[in-house]
Curated annotation (Swiss-Prot):
TM stretches of this protein: 23-43, 53-73, 92-112
Induction: Not induced by ethylene.
Catalytic activities: ATP + protein L-histidine = ADP + protein N-phospho-L-histidine
PROSITE patterns according to UniProt: HIS_KIN, RESPONSE_REGULATORY
Modified residues (Phosphohistidine): H353
Gene Ontology MF annotations: ATP binding; ethylene binding; ethylene receptor activity; metal ion binding; phosphorelay sensor kinase activity
Example GO BP: negative regulation of ethylene-activated signaling pathway
Compartments, record wording: Endoplasmic reticulum membrane
The name this protein goes by in its record: Ethylene receptor 2
Record family assignment: Belongs to the ethylene receptor family.
Length: 741
């Protein structure tokens, strides 16, 4: 016993207790050894773990604790010194690792607590995101409903369809019990129930617009909850209902349509609104949500826009229908006017032909009588007859010109002519007449005025003759001056003619002709009437003046055709007057001789006057006119053969005849076709006779047709002996006669 190294236990031995401690230490050791294994397993399975060294220390601490318990199993009995040393070493190591782990946990535990805090924060954030996602889903659903409702509302532009569709779609989308629209009356003092969803209330019911609940809704941009008992919310019978559904009202702006007058639209001098009322189902706990109210507000704005578009479309359709009616009426009036113009032109053409035929006889025979031996009294009577006949012919020409000017059928005959020679010719024509009245007439032509010009020579002469003729006619004594010069651009504009906008292009100029006289003068207030057809002022319409009052009216229209302006100035009766006109003419690219244009001339002393033996063939269906024309030609020495039909003419015509006069406006006979057949009958131009149209109608169509079929000229009835002499002289000299009137 003395050699035994066993340590005597300090405590009394109790076998049972020892057994339990032994077993407990064994299982504690097993648990301590299994815990690190589990930690190592799960750490390896974890992809991210920031505290690996802590786990190593903690695992070492647990392993050492388990080792102490395991070693402690050998300490319950007698044990050796080695066991004691191992036990002591294990406890020392356990103490060191435990202290190190404890020190490490001082730094780790706050991080672990912050992880928990972050976890709570993330949970709160996730909950907030869930709420936001719910709001986004709600907004998306609201937007989808808005798009659907907007599409349905804008699928039509009929106002009634828009409003009915709005109520139906809102009722279906929001599951409403009732939905209604109150529209303002034309007076703006009441709201009228115009549309309802279920149509159980009579449409047409009105409420005053100044109710507090209506003012409350109209004063807000948002949907407002209103009492179910208010007059505008009593849309459904409430008998048997325990609790009516919530009601909201929203205003619908009626956009101001200042450019449109909608017949059944309220007067919008101030801003007006319609009222939309929406009711949730009764006897339910359902309430209005924010997104539903936003949907209602957006739909109200869309309805306002759609209603404005519908109103504009309705007015546009009304305007279109009105325009169509007006167009139909205008088209009918245009056709009637065209029919009237054609009838007038036909009447004038017939009257022109029928009047010129007897006038041709009067003038021709009177001119023939002038060639005979007459007593002074007889000559005076013949001259009076001839003068009156010429005046009547001029009147007929004026009426026809005015008619063609008014219907736009008269066109200018543009050509190159000698402007200086034209002015001298007018001066020479007027000078003998002025000399009889002891008037001194002078012509002043500016040095910078182009010698040749491009324009209608005949109409320009007609304008100047009319203006100068009036000056001679209404002047008893004194002077008449004619001044012609190029109008400067700064002097073209005239405040009396605000519609006259002179535009001078390249190779163009404005001719200004001014005729000043010391005659009777005119009241300034009467001047505008001078350019009205058939109008004469009191000082002008003197007993001896004569005239139809057409001259200046025709001149004004001719001047307008030439893109010009004409006006008259006078200080009053007895102070004379000044007539001025401006017309646009062209400048020819190179000087060239103007085409031959025969105008009425006084008997000339030069040229051929004896046509003895000249064989002439005359076609005229009118016996009197045929006999008169034959007498004129025979008096000039011509050998005349007369025919009354086209067949006879074609049978008789031959190379022996030098000139053929033919009326191209005979009934049931195409004179132009006869001219073509005459051309076909002869091989060359020198073999066939010269063909001249002798007619009472000399409009542009007739002249164009004469040129087309190859006629050498046109002569307008009536024809005097001097006119016929000039026609034959020029025809035989130049073998062409463009026109003689």
């Amino acid at each position: 016993m003395e050699s035994c190294n066993c340590i005597e236990p300090q405590w009394p031995a109790d076998e049972l207790l020892m057994k339990y401690q032994y077993i407990s230490d064994f299982f504690i050791a097993i648990a301590y050894f299994s815990i690190p294994l589990e930690l190592i397993y799960f750490v390896k399975k974890s992809a991210v773990f920031p505290y690996r060294w802590v786990l190593v220390q903690f695992g070492a601490f647990i392993v050492l604790c388990g080792a102490t318990h395991l070693i402690n199993l050998w300490t319950f009995n007698m044990h050796s010194k080695t066991v004691e040393i191992v036990m002591t070493t294990a406890k020392i190591m356990t103490a060191v690792v435990s202290c190190a782990t404890a020190l490490m946990l001082v730094h780790i535990i706050p991080d672990l607590l912050s992880v928990k805090t972050r976890e709570l924060f993330l949970k709160n954030k996730a909950a907030e995101l869930d709420r936001e996602m719910g709001l986004i889903r709600t907004q998306e659903e609201t937007g989808r409903h808005v798009r659907m409702l907007t599409h349905e509302i804008r699928s039509t532009l009929d106002r009634h369809t828009i409003l009915k569709t709005t109520l139906v779609e809102l009722g279906r989308t929001l599951a409403l019990e009732e939905c209604a629209l109150w529209m303002p009356t034309r007076t703006g003092l009441e709201l009228q129930l115009s549309y309802t969803l279920r149509q159980q209330n009579p449409v047409g019911f009105t409420v005053p617009i100044h109710l507090p609940v209506i003012n409350q809704v109209f004063s807000s941009n948002h949907a407002i909850k209103i009492s179910p008992n208010s007059p505008i919310a009593r849309l459904r019978p409430i008998a048997g209902k325990y609790m009516p559904g919530e009601v909201v009202g929203v205003r619908v702006p009626l956009l101001h349509l200042s450019n449109f007058q909608i017949n059944d639209w309220p007067e919008l001098s101030t801003k007006r609104y319609a009222l939309m009322v929406l009711m949730l189902p009764s006897d339910s706990a359902r309430q209005w949500h924010v997104h539903e109210l936003e949907l209602v507000e957006v739909v109200a704005d869309q309805v306002a826009v759609a209603l404005s578009h519908a109103a504009i479309l309705e007015e546009s359709m009304r305007a279109r229908d009105l325009l169509m009616e007006q167009n139909v009426a205008l088209d009918m009036a245009r056709r009637e006017a065209e029919t009237a113009i054609r009838a007038r032109n036909d009447f004038l053409a017939v009257m022109n032909h029928e009047m010129r035929t007897p006038m041709h006889a009067i003038i021709a025979l009177s001119s023939l009588l002038q060639e005979t031996e007459l007593t002074p009294e007889q000559r005076l009577m013949v001259e009076t007859v001839l003068k009156s006949s010429n005046l009547l012919a001029t009147l007929i020409n004026d009426v026809l010109d005015l008619s063609r000017l008014e219907d736009g059928s008269l066109q200018l005959d543009i050509g190159t002519f000698n402007l200086h020679a034209l002015l001298r010719e007018v001066h020479n024509l007027i000078k003998p007449i002025a000399s009889v009245k002891k008037l001194c007439i002078s012509l002043n032509v500016a040095t910078d005025l182009p010698e040749y010009a491009v324009g209608d020579e005949k109409r320009l002469v007609q304008i100047i003759l009319n203006v100068v003729g009036n000056a001679v006619k209404f002047s008893k004594e004194g002077n008449i001056s004619i001044t012609a010069f190029v109008a400067k651009s700064e002097s073209l504009r005239d405040p009396r003619a605000p519609d006259f906008f002179p535009i001078c292009g390249e190779n163009q100029f404005y001719l200004r002709v001014q005729v000043k006289d010391s005659g009777l003068g005119i009241n300034p207030q009467d001047i505008p009437r001078l350019f009205t057809k058939f109008a004469q002022t009191q000082p002008v319409a003197t007993k001896n003046s004569g005239g139809s009052g057409l001259g200046l009216a025709i001149c004004k229209r001719f001047v307008n055709l030439m893109e010009g302006h004409i006006w008259i100035d006078s200080e009053g009766p007895g102070k004379g007057c000044t007539a001025t006109f401006v017309v646009k003419l062209g400048i020819p690219e190179r000087s060239s001789e103007p085409k031959l244009l025969l105008m009425p001339k006084v008997p000339a002393n030069h040229g051929q006057t004896n046509f003895s033996g000249l064989k002439v063939l005359l076609l005229d269906d009118n016996g009197v006119s045929r006999a008169v024309t034959r007498g004129l030609l025979a008096h000039l020495g011509c050998d005349v053969t007369t025919v009354s039909s086209s067949d006879e003419l074609l049978r008789v015509v031959s190379q022996d005849y030098k000139v053929v006069f033919m009326d191209v406006c005979m009934p049931e006979v195409d004179g132009f076709e006869i001219a073509v057949r005459i051309h076909e009958k002869f091989m060359t131009r020198h073999e066939r006779p010269l063909i001249v149209a002798l007619t009472g109608n000399i409009d542009q169509v007739t002249k164009d047709n004469c040129t087309r079929v190859g006629m050498e000229g046109v002569v307008l009835k009536p024809v005097s002996i001097d006119k016929m002499r000039n026609v034959l002289s020029n025809l035989l000299e130049h073998r062409v006669l463009f026109e003689a009137i």
